[in-house]
Amino acid sequence: MSEKNKLPKGIIVLKTLSMPENINANGDIFGGWIMSQMDLGGAILAKEISGGKVATVRVDSINFLKSVSVGDIVNCYANCIKIGKSSIKINVEIWIKKIYSKPLGQYYCAAEAIFIYVAINKTGQPRELLPMSII
């Protein structure tokens, strides 16, 4: 499938607006902010799957594909790739809808990554996953 025909994978787990306080020296949205939104979105899905607390333990193969501008709508999609004894592997994508910058209305994938979360107990130790209660 060509990039032009690519569709988001998974469900939308987070939607926000890129703001001026998140720009880098080039005037684009800082990649670290994008990564933090991806971690939040992935953690939401991981918490729903685990039925409790999770901790991010690793990020694999993060790719920043296109820049993001101030005022763009940032959509975070996530889907579960694998469930282990205590770990959850989540594919996360950031899709951008252009509102204030050209071309208006364009929708594209700006970043993608694999996040690994571990279900944890009240003391922060890994715990066995509970059966999925939703999704």
Swiss-Prot record:
Entry protein name: Uncharacterized acyl-CoA thioester hydrolase BU274
Any Pfam family the entry gives: 4HBT
GO molecular function: long-chain fatty acyl-CoA hydrolase activity
Biological process according to GO: acyl-CoA metabolic process; fatty acid catabolic process
PANTHER family documented for this protein: ACYL COENZYME A THIOESTER HYDROLASE, ACYL-COA THIOESTER HYDROLASE YCIA
SUPFAM superfamilies reported for this sequence: Thioesterase/thiol ester dehydrase-isomerase (SSF54637)
Domain of life: Bacteria
UniProt keywords, alphabetically: Hydrolase
EC number: 3.1.2.-
Keyword Hydrolase: yes
Domain HotDog ACOT-type: 8-123
InterPro entries found in the cross-reference section: Cytosol_ACT, HOTDOG_ACOT, HotDog_dom_sf, Thioestr_dom
Class of the enzyme per the UniProt entry, highest EC level: hydrolase
Similarity-based family: Belongs to the acyl coenzyme A hydrolase family.
Hydrolase recorded as keyword: yes
GO terms for cellular component: cytosol
CDD domains with a match to the protein in the record: BFIT_BACH
